[in-house]
Amino acid sequence: MKHTLFAAALGLALTACSPVNHNHAPQTAAQSQSPSTMERNKANALAFYELAFNQHDLQRAVRQYVGKEYLQHNPMVADSGQAFIDTFAPFLKQNPQSRASVKRVIAEGDLVALHVHSQLSPEDKGEAVVDIFRFDNDGKIVEHWDVIQPVPKEKTASGRSMF
């Protein structure tokens, strides 16, 4: 237990000291997104998630909501909408009861973040997921980052849920 806490603390400390690397240019005032554009991007992120992870319609999700260029930062998924489909189609076939419940949606500029409870089945404790999507000017997803953490089987130290 001590080793786990030490490793977690060390990892957090090292991450906090790491330089930030932005793979896309920061927005200027002229490029900043209007509230209506951010609302559109939030709606598109939610619709993409519903199609892909609840209806399991990956083809339609990618066709409607992913741009021609799609950069992926998940180490298990290659760039492109087709790579997303190729990665998740076998997973969804193997886990037909999998569902994703979006708990929070946050937008800033061209970015939308979703805080999600992902489960393989209704009985599964699941995972807490934060997906961050970057949108182009047409409201298409062109870049993706994610952070995934298992939901503990026992009570959390704080007694609060992850959601």
Question: Regions from the language model: what does each represent?
Answer:
Residues 7-15:
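Bacterial N-terminal signal peptides
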